[in-house]
Design a protein with these regions (language model features):
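Key DNA-contacting residues within the recognition helix of helix-turn-helix
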Residues: 6, 31-32, 59
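DNA major-groove recognition helix of helix-turn-helix
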Residues: 9, 34-35, 43, 62
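Residues within the alpha-helical elements of helix-turn-helix
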Residues: 11, 22, 50
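Short alpha-helical "recognition helix" segments of helix-turn-helix
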Residues: 18-20
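DNA major-groove recognition helix of helix-turn-helix/homeodomain DNA-binding modules
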Residues: 43-57
């Protein structure tokens, strides 16, 4: 759902398990959130910090 999250994860060379660990989730839980887009505010904040990106960019749904 959020292509920029996946793109930044790939740029950082991180696996789904590594990102899930930072967020305090299971790998499957993180993958489900990627599909549904249902991240908590705290998880969004952690992803923005981890990838050094702004919220608007990281969670953009436009092409």
């Amino acid at each position: 759902m959020y292509k920029n999250v996946k793109a930044e994860q790939a740029r950082a060379g991180m696996t789904n398990q590594q990102v899930a660990n930072v967020l305090g989730l299971s790998r499957r839980g993180y993958e489900n959130k990627l599909k549904t887009g249902h991240f908590t505010i705290n998880e969004c904040r952690k992803l923005c910090e981890m990838f050094s990106c702004g919220f608007d960019y990281l969670f953009s749904t436009t092409e």
